[in-house]
């Protein structure tokens, strides 16, 4: 827990003035973890838009979906355009997606990813959702690999080591790490201690631990000491850059 007088002990300024500035050094061929569950709620929409405008190419994106907001629509405010990683696919910036739910629940409403995948413009690594979360967590914890029974005997286990433990078969899954994580949070203090809200609680807290650089957009930034320590979801050590959303 930090008091307001502790700012002198932490001189590094993590606060950026714009989303464009915060993502400006993301190069081609980067691997990114991008938050969100399905719709745009809890998703770092402003950082994704800034990355689209930056134009970095040949990106590998690790996310729960490959972009469903434009076809599902739930969670999008009236009059707002749905934003998720689908806009990066449309802009031909992604070469590979590692995800659990890459396609639309409705065949009549294909996503940008589905259209690109059908044209062989983007690669897909399909990962069961629980396995995806654990692979990301393992990356942040320094665990190189683990065995899980999920997916044994299916396409997701093809080419992977299978071992038997106590009479049951398990598949070896490797950890996931990223160069950058783009994250949405509700609140941050000036040091980067985060509080999540709603669907931003899902993958965000593990993604920030598994990325070399974590970039966070927040609804509000408060002074040091204004967030009670017991309420902190992600401690400052995992946060590198913070941008406050000026308009909601």
Regions found by a protein language model. Give the residues of each.
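Conserved alpha/beta enzyme-core scaffold
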Residues: 10-248
